[in-house]
Design a protein with these regions (language model features):
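Dinucleotide-binding Rossmann-like beta1-alpha1 core, especially the glycine-rich loop
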Residues: 49-133
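Helix-loop-beta segment of a Rossmann-like dinucleotide-binding subdomain
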Residues: 131-161
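Glycine-rich FAD pyrophosphate-binding loop
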Residues: 25-46
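Beta1/beta-strand and adjacent pyrophosphate-binding region of the FAD-binding site
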Residues: 2-16, 32
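Short alpha-helical patches at coil-to-helix transitions and adjacent helical residues
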Residues: 17, 44-51, 159
Length: 161
């Protein structure tokens, strides 16, 4: 590489560029990565910091995708225990929700199972419990809800890239 010759030029130092550069270089290719601004300064810096298993894909019944995303989430959590924290999420459902709370609770249990029980178990929550847990939430139209776990990065996700 002293001659400045590379096999591959990766343009963009976000998550996709970083992973591509890593994968290519791990296969013996000489890789140059260029970034217009600071490393991971674009979209990779603007995320929610969630490391999730794809809960929303249960609605389309893509169980294979959800299981794969959960496995990836679990591997990251195990590999970087000081950088990821299991976090509880509470979803309150009103009368306009696409599913009744009891059905969403079944989905949360399926999500937990597809995630190989690696997080705290999900919980069905009544309107009264949601009101007690989150007094700032207007529960006048709430029918019930679910509480489940996923992971969050504990610091700047751009640096995690």
């Amino acid at each position: 590489m002293d001659d400045g010759t590379f096999d591959v030029l990766v343009v963009g130092g976000g998550i996709n560029g970083a992973v591509s550069a890593l994968a290519l270089s791990s296969h013996g290719l000489r890789v140059a990565l260029v970034e217009r601004h600071d490393f991971a300064s674009g979209t990779s810096q603007e995320s929610s910091c969630m490391v999730w298993g794809g809960f929303k894909y249960l609605e389309s019944r893509d169980l294979k995708l959800v299981a794969g995303l959960c496995d990836s989430r679990n591997r990251l959590a195990k590999a970087f225990p000081t950088r990821l924290a299991e976090t509880r999420f509470l979803a309150a459902m009103d009368h306009g929700a696409p599913f009744p709370p009891w059905f969403a609770s079944l989905g949360a249990v399926a999500y937990w199972g597809l995630g190989r029980l690696a997080t705290q178990p999900p919980r069905h929550r009544s309107r009264e419990t949601i009101e007690r847990l989150e007094p700032a939430v207007d529960t006048s139209l709430v029918r019930g809800g679910i509480e489940y776990s996923d992971y969050l990065l504990v610091d700047n996700d751009a640096r995690f890239v």
